[in-house]
């Protein structure tokens, strides 16, 4: 007689990316956070593995930690300079990002035709973690089949939300996620043709 197979819960860093939220990790208001040098940031309970994984929703603190410390979003370990890969980033000219409203976050001396790797809110991962990360990602994030090496230079762009102070009711800007933009040495002489229309 065959023994019943008891399903194992998903393992963080193996089946489920380290950076994702879990259903028991409720929002926790806004307050100072070391991930943004003490600035006000959106906060969230820290209970990885509690409840059900929410693969399409990054945990606020773990996301900021992953970008600031270059931690692999799959396993949560540091990525060395020679082992940083982006599965979801897109190459675009700096001028296109400026046209989308990210101009103040990019270095002033970065030419508009310089190609950057816009990684959004997903930090680079280890090459060895790529297959597991791809299996765990929602299909909508896998539109581009290419794995891209992450450039040696980058900038971090804080993304803000409006948070309400519980006592005064006043709204304050709070960092939600950190966007990561890698800076390449490539140029796109036709970058203006890729500007948003309208």
Per-region residue spans from a language model:
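N-terminal alpha-helical interaction blocks
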Residues: 1-69, 149-198
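Non-catalytic terminal/accessory regions
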Residues: 47-54, 74-78, 82
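Short cysteine-rich clusters marking metal-coordination/redox-active sites
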Residues: 72-75, 126-129
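Short Cys/His-rich "knuckle" micro-motifs
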Residues: 79-87, 133-139
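Short cysteine/histidine-rich metal-coordination sites, predominantly Zn2+-binding motifs
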Residues: 87-97, 141-150
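Short linker/helix segments within small regulatory modules
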Residues: 103-123
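Polybasic, low-complexity binding patches
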Residues: 115, 121, 133-159
